[in-house]
Amino acid sequence: MINISKKAQEHFTSLLSNEPENTQIRVFIVNPGTPNAECGVAFCPENEIELSDIQLKYDGFFVYVNKDTISYLKNSVIDLVTDKIGSQLTLKAPYAKNNFSKKVSSSLEEKVKCFLNLEINPQLSMHGGRVELMKIDENGIAAIQFSGGCNGCSMIGSTLKETVEKKLLSSFSEIKKVYDETHHLHGQHSFY
């Protein structure tokens, strides 16, 4: 799925040796499927690994990628390029800007789930969080649930109103209201 050159793997192993035990690597993408798509690489402490992550094994470390964005990282290459000035990691992701959402979904729920995965979750995943659609009732009320860094976060009211609800209401005329049914518990997993 993600081809990491031998030099880049050695570089990651060296970097990880200076990090807390069980820290791994995360490859992420922001705004996938859009002209503004950007990929990145970051350290992934053990407490930031999510159930929605896919684990990829390399020589001496693991790479974690959110399963909802993995298709955008198909045939990606991470390399360590060295020149006269120094060395730099490069990440080339040929499918990062592909719009896979053009596939026709049969139901409103499927369309909303796809929208959340493509438009909202990549932003939330930068803070270790995600949102899932639980159901849409006959009155157009969408019930959602936050997890990871969003669960118990003191900014969740703002995230719900300014990010999730505003975007869902403007994108889907059938949705009249968004309801958060998460049982929020503030803890170490919470972003704020």
UniProtKB/Swiss-Prot annotation:
It comes from the Bacteria. The keyword 4Fe-4S applies. Binds 1 [4Fe-4S] cluster per subunit. The cluster is presumably bound at the interface of two monomers. [4Fe-4S] cluster binds at residues 150, 153. The keyword DNA repair does not apply. Coiled coil: none annotated. Keywords: 4Fe-4S, Iron, Iron-sulfur, Metal-binding. Its cofactor is [4Fe-4S] cluster. One of its GO terms (biological process) is protein maturation. InterPro entries: Fe/S_biogenesis_protein_NfuA (IPR017726), FeS_biogenesis (IPR000361), FSCA_dom_sf (IPR034904), HesB-like_dom_sf (IPR035903), NIF_FeS_clus_asmbl_NifU_C (IPR001075). GO terms for molecular function: 4 iron, 4 sulfur cluster binding; iron ion binding. Belongs to the NfuA family. Homodimer. Involved in iron-sulfur cluster biogenesis. Binds a 4Fe-4S cluster, can transfer this cluster to apoproteins, and thereby intervenes in the maturation of Fe/S proteins. Could also act as a scaffold/chaperone for damaged Fe/S proteins. This is Fe/S biogenesis protein NfuA. The lineage of its organism: Bacteria, Pseudomonadati, Pseudomonadota, Gammaproteobacteria, Enterobacterales.
